[in-house]
Amino acid sequence: LLSVFAMIASTSFTDNNMMMAKEKEEIVELPFKGLEKLNLTYIEPVLVEIPEVDQNQMFLDAIGFKESGNRYDIVNKFGYMGRYQFGRGTLKGLGYKVTQEEFLTSPEIQERAMMDLLRHNKKKLQKYIDQYEGEVVHGILITESGILAAAHLGGQGNVKKFFRRGKEFKDGFGTSITSYMEMFGGYRIEI
């Protein structure tokens, strides 16, 4: 409503109580009643430059917050560790040979491991990203960031099962990969 009012140059009212606005030879009907007593004037719009945002960092921060409250030093009841709740098997599969203490006390290792996992999953899931990105599957708008977040939660194998057979995976807390596809979809990430 407010943005419409900010662009009104002159107003008039018709018999049926519809407000008419005329701006640069363009007439717009606004279905508002009871506005006859308002004295509307044109307000010049102010343009503000919005800085470019780092979509990768926003994506990582969002996943980190969901997984651990963005805490690097936390271990959950299933033994998953750090900001992104890595399992020992995932770290080993990525080639990391660190102790739990080394991992929990090194934000640098955790961030590098997350980027390595995202790159690994993207490589394994590129066919599905190419095929389904922008499509609605089982009611979910599919995006690259959503697929990669789902793979982080449930593994790339479970993401493939979802696309091949519609099979839903949930982790030990009952969180589904489709909830991650929705929650973390739409980020413009560069992995």
Model-derived features with residue positions:
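N-terminal secretory targeting signals
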Residues: 1-58, 178-191
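A short, structure-level motif marking secondary-structure boundaries and short turns
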Residues: 44-46, 72-74, 133-134
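Solvent-exposed, acidic/flexible segments
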Residues: 49-57, 76-84, 103-111, 141-145, ...
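Short, functionally critical alpha-helical segments immediately adjacent to catalytic or ligand/cofactor-binding
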Residues: 54-71, 114, 148-155
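Short, solvent-exposed loop/turn elements at domain surfaces
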Residues: 70-75, 92-94, 161
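Substrate-binding/active-site groove segments that recognize
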Residues: 77-97, 118, 152
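Alpha-helical segment that forms one wall of the substrate-binding/catalytic cleft
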Residues: 96-145, 153-160
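Catalytic and substrate-binding regions of cell-wall glycan-acting enzymes that process beta-1,4-linked
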Residues: 137-191
